[in-house]
Amino acid sequence: MSWNRRSFLGALGVTCLAGAGMVPIVRPRTAAAADEFDLLRERWCSLVTGSGYDPDVEPFKSRLAALGAEAEQYLTTLAPGETSLWPDLPLDTSTWNMTLSARRLRTMAVAYLVPGTGHTGNSAMAEAAVTAFDELTTRFYAPPHWWGNWWDWLIGTPQALNDFCALLYEQLGPELIDRYVQRVDHYVDPGAIDRTTGANRGWLCEVTAVRGVLGKSPEMMAKARDGLSPIMVYVTDGDGFYRDGSFIQHEYYAYTGSYGISLLQSVSGLFALLAGSTWEIVDPNRQVLFDSIENSFAPFVYNGLLMDAVAGRVISREAEHDHWRGHLLAASVLRMAEAGSPEEAKRWRGIVKGWLLRESEPRYMGDQTLTMAAVADAQAVLDDPTIEPLPEPVEHRIFAAMDQAVHRRPTWAFSISMRSVRTAFYETINGENLKGWHTGVGMTYWWGADFGNDHYTDGFWPTADPYRLPGTTVSRKPLEDGVGNNVLPTEAWAGGTTDGEFAAVGQSIQALESTLRGRKSWFCLDDAVVCLGAGITCADGYAVDTTVDQRNLGENGVHDFRLNGIPSPTSGTWSLTVPNARWAHLEGFGGYVFPGGARVSAIRETRTGSWYDINVGGPRDELRRRYVTVYLDHGVDPVDASYVYLVMPGATRQETIRRAADRRWLRVLANTADRQAISVPSLGFVGANFFAPGTVDALTVDQPCSVLVRVADGRATICVSDPRQDGSTVRVTWNRPVASVVSSDPTVRVVEAGERLVLDVTVEETAGMTQRAVVALA
């Protein structure tokens, strides 16, 4: 449903509690009796329950029945006592149990109101829920109680209870509603919104707005609306959205795929709630939020999943996997489409439709955690023939503010997760993400158009070897669970440069709780990512590995794997080291090439673990997964070790062998601690990461920087960035004749263009983003 001021004012003469065609209990009122707050409350109910769908057809019929069964379970097990409403959720040991109790009440309210649950209009359900609500807000969510996690008191519990009160507003009556509003005012004090940023601020604005609706408070409505304004600006440090598309939460963490989604959920709900009302969101900076959908969120979605690289500690939660997060984002984008321009709305719906149609298991429409509203919105898009599903883009994006990069090709996607003095190694709080120590030292992820889409979903994090994460160079020194929270590296060089299709990405690595140092680069090309490492030095007294890949084959995977042509058995535990291997291939995933040959090791094994091992709130059930791991052993305490390898997602065995045999495809121009560079003549590509001033082939620079050159059709595009984000001007000399400068960014000054090209590139205040010039070749 599209919300606007005309439809809002017209609705003042009509009332239904949870959307057209949805409510079994109709309460007619005169137009005079329905004030603006009544309509806002009814609109919020519609946003909670969904509208415009037929409860007698799938996928709604079975979902409504499941909702009813869940509510019935809560009804039959409800047993208010001294310390709980439900025996399995003691309220004196965990404030999270208070939030979960509130959510159960909300489920009961929804089951009572919507058709097809088997409890529609069931007075016993409503009466039990109201009685339990009375208990909760008298003895538990009430002053002077205050302990545990602040989030449950200010956000989690009132979010669910707001929905509950809106849904059962008339059953609760003025006295209980008024008392509840006072509870919210006590915990969400007048300064609460202004003390928060990012997702927390969005959540609190939502809590305040719905509380304002329930209490009919214009002041609270204005406070909630105005509280959104600081979210709708670009930041240059700390929490929020950055111009390059980054989203940071908790000061130092890439959190687009967790807190970022939560922010979009809250804000999209408020746009829908307030549209056309006295408190409509009209801040001109709201375009920042609209732009974030394609600038911040969509680049991290592939075939409907939202990449783990930007999910922080959430990767340790069993239920909140990459597909589930993608579902939440899709639902929020569809809701936000109601607020965007017609062009944006059409494009966003097309993006989401593409995600829905391409997604592998677990699919959106089978996700039982989604609300009826989210399912109804998605079904409407799927059923609309005028909405064209948009394909995955072919592009490269560097998110310099949060040290992330994403490379997209027609049949695969690849992500690189880095850290620097700007971003902490990993976050572990509340007993979560206990072994995430090395997720930021160059971890790589990749997925194919039709393979590997459940690789990280299927028990990867509790069963994978945390010392051999793909792409990382790591000391085997044992680390304690949870060590190093909020610790930042001292190295500044992380990032790279891109022409929008290919890229040179690099990182000066510093490992957590280790003496390990080194340089890593990834050159992202058409059918491969070329990976270089150099200057790898460590004095921990432990072996150091570079992990080429650690592939999860599932519980019983028997994929064919060959190292330099030597097959591995498909069962049991197997390991092999080949002194001069040139290639490896894993059926169903892709190939790996080692130019010039390398000492390569591989393991096939069954690994076990539980979610509890990495998250104290996770189940203890043991999981078993089969893995193939390919790695380079640099030995104990290496000095200036190096490597070169290619990852070829989706490549067949024959394609891998051909690339390994082609000695002319790749030229490694430099691979030292000061500079890493390659040339691929067939692509007209040169990429160079300078960790110090110097010369590589025809390129000379006077400051640390990243440079990419693409030559095609008589022109060259020169791209430059400052991954350290602390420089002022970089002089780049390309020792090749040029005829003229076709175009350049305002930051690029042409010093010389003739027998050679000399550019002075102002990188100060460019935040690590790429600066470009295009020249015609002589």
From Swiss-Prot:
UniProt-recorded Gene Ontology molecular function terms: carbohydrate binding; carbon-oxygen lyase activity, acting on polysaccharides
InterPro entries: Chondroitin_lyas, Gal_mutarotase_sf_dom, GH-type_carb-bd, Lyase_8, Lyase_8-like_C, Lyase_8_alpha_N, Lyase_8_C, Lyase_8_central_dom
Catalysed conversion reaction: [hyaluronan](n) = n 3-(4-deoxy-beta-D-gluc-4-enuronosyl)-N-acetyl-D-glucosamine + H2O
Enzyme category, top tier: lyase
GO CC terms in record: extracellular region
Temperature dependence: Optimum temperature is 70 degrees Celsius. Is very stable at temperatures from 0 to 60 degrees Celsius.
Keyword tags: Lyase, Signal
Span of the signal peptide: 1-33
PROSITE patterns: TAT
pH sensitivity of activity: Optimum pH is 6.6. Activity is completely abolished above pH 8.6.
Keyword Membrane (UniProt): no
Biotech exploitation of the protein: Due to its high optimal temperature and stability under a broad pH range and high temperature, TcHly8B could serve as a promising tool for the industrial production of hyaluronate oligosaccharides and promote the further exploitation of hyaluronate lyases with novel properties.
Modifications the protein undergoes after translation, according to the UniProt entry: Predicted to be exported by the Tat system. The position of the signal peptide cleavage has not been experimentally proven.
A biological process term (GO) from this entry: carbohydrate metabolic process
Regulation: Is salt-dependent and is active over a wide range of NaCl concentrations. Activity is slightly promoted by Ni(2+), and inhibited by most of the tested metal ions, including Li(+), K(+), Ba(2+), Mg(2+), Zn(2+), Ca(2+), Mn(2+) and Al(3+).
Superkingdom of origin: Bacteria
Active site: 200, 250, 259
Record's keyword annotation contains Signal: yes
EC nos: 4.2.2.1
Family: Belongs to the polysaccharide lyase 8 family.
Function: Degrades hyaluronic acid into unsaturated disaccharides as the end products. Exhibits very low activity against various types of chondroitin sulfate variants.
Protein name stated in the entry: Hyaluronate lyase
Source organism of the structure: Thermasporomyces composti
Name of encoding gene: tchly8B
